[in-house]
Regions:
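Short, cationic motifs built from Arg/Lys/His that form the positively charged side of catalytic pockets
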Residues: 67-69, 199-202
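Glycine-rich adenosine-cofactor-binding loop
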Residues: 1-8
Length: 203
């Protein structure tokens, strides 16, 4: 029941789906309403979990990758299901795109032809993904970022708002790119970069 949950709920409702409720581990929120939808219980409440895959689908609205992974694994192991995608009706996605499970694609996102998007990625409002970009699992791309054609983004990379990544380079696993940066060279796995041009930040 956070900003991402509210945004996902809006997407599902605009697309004509019924949202039955939120699950949140903050017990102080239970039985309260958020945007006219009740917070029903915790994410480990079997009374609600047993409905997933039979009576309804689920989406994991969490931007913390560690928690997101834990919840994905729980759904897979306990319910043998994968979360659905939340794709805004105003997103423009090319016909020939590969899209995995559990992805959040917000309003104004543009995805070019030949793009491959893995599982459980977050593409925030207005970001542009050029042709033949490869995006691995659990990647986050901030609002207004431009990912040029042929870029490879490895698992768990984080790209802040308003970033520009030039064509053909690789963003390594777990790399972090600060907001507003212009990336003109490959970013190593686990590296944090910032600036124009983006440079590694020394710890």
């Amino acid at each position: 029941a956070n900003y991402l949950g509210r945004a996902a709920k809006e997407i599902f409702e605009v697309n004509g789906n019924v949202v039955y409720g939120f699950l949140d581990d903050n017990k102080s929120l239970h039985n309260k309403e958020l945007d006219e939808t009740f917070i029903l219980g915790s994410t480990d409440d079997d009374g609600f979990l047993k409905l997933i895959g039979k009576k309804c689908e689920a989406f994991i609205a969490v931007d913390d990758n560690r928690l997101r992974k834990n919840l994905v694994n729980m759904l897979h192991e306990v319910r043998h299901v994968q979360p659905v995608n939340a794709v805004h009706s105003n997103a423009l996605i090319a016909k020939h795109v590969e899209l995995g499970h559990g992805n959040f694609i917000d309003q104004g996102v543009k995805v070019g032809v030949g793009v491959k998007i893995g599982n459980h990625c977050l593409l925030q409002a207005g970001c542009i993904i050029g042709a033949e970009v490869s995006i691995s699992d659990f990647v986050q791309i901030g609002s207004g970022s431009i990912i040029s054609s042929g870029v490879t983004i490895e698992e768990e990379a984080f790209i802040g708002a308003g970033v520009t990544v030039v064509s053909g380079i690789t963003i390594g696993k777990g790399a972090r790119i600060g907001a507003g940066s212009v990336v003109v060279a490959p970013v190593k796995a686990g590296e944090t970069v910032f600036g124009n041009p983006a440079q590694p930040i020394k710890s």
